[in-house]
Amino acid sequence: MLGLRLIVGLGNPGSEYIKTRHNAGFRFVDGLVQREGQCWALESKLFAYVARVFIAGQWVWLLRPVTFMNLSGKSIFAGLNFWKIKPEQMLVAHDELDFPPGAVRLKFDGGHGGQNGLRDITKLLGHGRFHRLRVGIGHPGHKERVVSWVLGCPTCDENIAIDAALERASVVLPLAVAGDFDGAMKKLHTVV
């Protein structure tokens, strides 16, 4: 299987959204940029901030859309076309209501599961054949409270759990970049 050439973090732009649960994907790619000592650069034709990091012996593009979550596909579609990257070589990091804070899973292919960023991406691509990093943020318990939940800030304990999950994901990232997704999934999904 082909390795990763593009890692996308989903979230909403703007200072009022920086620390929200919905921006778990942004937190992941921001952590990669910081860890590798790189900087984001605005690329207006891609509707995103972009950076490059060196992982597992190769350069990987990072993309952080400046569009709102429900329009993320526009930026991703532009990036894939500009860099001539196949969707199967892309990892999209996003918040996941169905997992508690601290849980993180890799997945390939599938539907959007109600996640508006994934909904827009699959609509524009015409399929869901790309990798996802599903970062648990928990569920408020009632469907009516989902919007305020995802746009709310995690508690201190939730933040600690989410940060630990993102760290575990970054540890297995070299395997995924090298194309060993089974190995990355096994290592990430095995709780020690």
From Swiss-Prot:
The active site is at H22. Keywords: Cytoplasm, Hydrolase, RNA-binding, tRNA-binding. One of its GO terms (cellular component) is cytoplasm. One of its GO terms (biological process) is rescue of stalled ribosome. The record marks D95 as: Stabilizes the basic form of H active site to accept a proton. Gene3D superfamilies: Peptidyl-tRNA hydrolase. It comes from the Bacteria. Its EC number is 3.1.1.29. Belongs to the PTH family. Monomer. Hydrolyzes ribosome-free peptidyl-tRNAs (with 1 or more amino acids incorporated), which drop off the ribosome during protein synthesis, or as a result of ribosome stalling. Catalyzes the release of premature peptidyl moieties from peptidyl-tRNA molecules trapped in stalled 50S ribosomal subunits, and thus maintains levels of free tRNAs and 50S ribosomes. This is Peptidyl-tRNA hydrolase. It comes from Xylella fastidiosa (strain M12). The lineage of its organism: Bacteria, Pseudomonadati, Pseudomonadota, Gammaproteobacteria, Lysobacterales.
